Amino acid sequence: MFKLRIYKLSGADKGNLDHEEFFSEREEMETRYNELFVYENYSLNPTAWENVDGEWKRLEGF
């Protein structure tokens, strides 16, 4: 199981978590990540996570 954490890009809550999207396959998550990624957003881009033994671990390179 994989997830993307999507962050607010504007307003008073800028940078706070907006929502999470869940995926059963890494490839699905990567496709969605690439749709959302904007270089100029730097730290506001989504973060990618994998569920390993019941714990969410952040994936490097995303």
What residue ranges belong to the model's regions?
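A short beta-strand micro-motif
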Residues: 2-11
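A short, charged, amphipathic alpha-helix used as a generic interaction element across diverse proteins
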Residues: 11-15, 22-45
